[in-house]
């Protein structure tokens, strides 16, 4: 009898541990879902940035067709692009790679690309180079530096979403426990009729009702 009760308790403990493991896995899955959503935004931002770069090259191309490009008008376009945006700096180069003009943060390209080993801040920068097409080939190149760093407000929103999902899982668990105790309160289930338990000799209420009807 004691062995049977111990076996039953072990089975129940295994079931409880299994359910808790599933709950932890679901909560971690909620965190993974939020992080994966954030990662999926990066390719979309890059695609939008390349679309913007192509549009900028179309505006700059007429200013590059002469022997001496109009630096003032090109610089005005670049200032408009880099003003209060996630584009840190922008530069236009001729077909030989010589800088014509640039706008935005005054950071050296070597430092921006961390070519000298100084990687502070370069982890969150991404370079986009788009050719400025002409009739007979590229007239030059446009270089943009994107800020891919996640802002504190965006990170906080992701954390809030994760916490809400976890709270919903815990509430679902609590509701399930309350419903189970409410619906099964005072009722013994079929597993309690096992011959190895002390309650085996006591019939369940359903059987008592059937006997009274007969």
UniProtKB/Swiss-Prot annotation:
Positions of transmembrane segments: 164-184
Pfam family, one: SMP_2
Gene: smp
Keyword Glycoprotein: no
Signal peptide from the UniProt entry: 1-30
Family per record: Belongs to the Smp family.
Cellular component GO terms held in the UniProt record: plasma membrane
Keywords of this entry: Cell membrane, Membrane, Signal, Transmembrane, Transmembrane helix
Full protein name: Protein Smp
Membrane topology qualifier: Single-pass membrane protein
Subcellular location: Cell membrane
């Amino acid at each position: 009898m004691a062995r049977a009760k111990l076996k039953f308790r072990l089975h129940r403990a295994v079931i409880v541990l299994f359910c808790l493991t599933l709950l932890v896995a679901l909560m971690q899955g909620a965190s993974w879902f939020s992080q994966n959503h954030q990662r999926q935004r990066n390719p979309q931002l890059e695609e939008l940035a390349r679309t913007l770069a192509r549009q900028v090259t179309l505006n700059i191309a007429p200013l590059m067709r002469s022997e001496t490009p109009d630096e003032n008008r090109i610089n005005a376009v670049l200032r408009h692009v880099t003003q209060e945006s996630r584009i840190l700096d922008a530069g236009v180069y001729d077909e030989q790679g010589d800088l014509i003009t640039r706008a935005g943060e005054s950071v050296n390209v070597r430092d921006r690309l961390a070519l000298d080993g100084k990687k502070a801040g370069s982890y969150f920068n991404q370079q986009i180079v788009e050719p400025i097409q002409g009739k007979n080939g590229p007239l030059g190149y446009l270089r943009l530096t994107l800020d891919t760093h996640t802002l504190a407000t965006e990170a906080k929103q992701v954390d809030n979403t994760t916490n809400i999902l976890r709270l919903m899982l815990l509430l679902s668990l609590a509701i399930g426990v309350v419903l189970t105790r409410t619906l099964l309160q005072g009722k013994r289930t079929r597993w309690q009729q096992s011959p190895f338990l002390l309650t085996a000799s006591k019939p369940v209420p359903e059987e008592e009702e059937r006997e009274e009807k007969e």
